[in-house]
Regions:
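Extracytoplasmic
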Residues: 16-50
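Helical-face signature of the major facilitator-like transporter fold
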Residues: 24-25, 29, 61, 95, ...
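Structural signature of transmembrane alpha-helices in multi-pass secondary transporters
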Residues: 28, 57-60, 64, 114-115, ...
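Residue-level signature of mid-helix packing/kink "hotspots" within the transmembrane helices
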Residues: 33, 60-69, 119
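Juxtamembrane helix-start elements in MFS-like secondary transporters
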Residues: 49-57
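Cytoplasmic helix-loop-helix junction between adjacent transmembrane helices
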Residues: 110-147
Length: 150
């Protein structure tokens, strides 16, 4: 097995992109699944029924599959940097709207829209594959996916 040319302690060029990509993925993943540690508080604050909790859990992933296709198309057209930047900005806004929700309906709508954030994975895969040569793409994408899903 050959060693890779990835110096994880470097913040130059491709390694900088790798670190920024996995951190962006980490942020999207954290926003996408922020409801899990908050669910007990949400249940109590909003008086959610077990069915409403299940609905929120389903809504969280309902938009993700079509969103990954849409995001993939946008990445092909506009490039990963622009699309990731826009996705991060939108996901931050959605997270704030979710935090300011006053009813189950507002929680449900914002949770559904936050499913779009789960498409961030697609962007980083493309970005990493553009910056790393074929012999390093596997390890780079492993770092991106592994650290991003921390």
């Amino acid at each position: 097995m050959t060693t890779t040319g990835i110096n994880l302690f470097s913040f130059q060029r491709k390694t900088k992109i790798l670190h920024l990509s996995w951190f962006a993925f980490f942020l999207t993943f954290m926003i996408w699944f922020n409801h899990a540690p908050l669910m007990a508080t949400l249940r109590e604050t909003f008086g959610l029924t077990p069915q409403e909790v299940k609905t929120l859990l389903i809504l969280n992933v309902a938009l993700t599959i079509p969103a990954r296709i849409i995001i993939g198309m946008l990445v092909d057209r506009y490039g990963p940097r622009i699309v990731y930047s826009i996705l991060l900005a939108i996901s931050g806004l959605l997270c704030l709207l979710y935090a300011m929700a006053n009813s189950f309906e507002q929680l449900a709508i914002t949770r559904f829209l936050m499913g779009f954030v789960g498409a961030g994975f697609v962007i980083g895969i493309r970005m990493v594959s553009e910056w790393f040569p074929a012999r390093e793409v596997g390890i780079a994408e492993g770092i991106y996916g592994g650290w991003g899903n921390f």
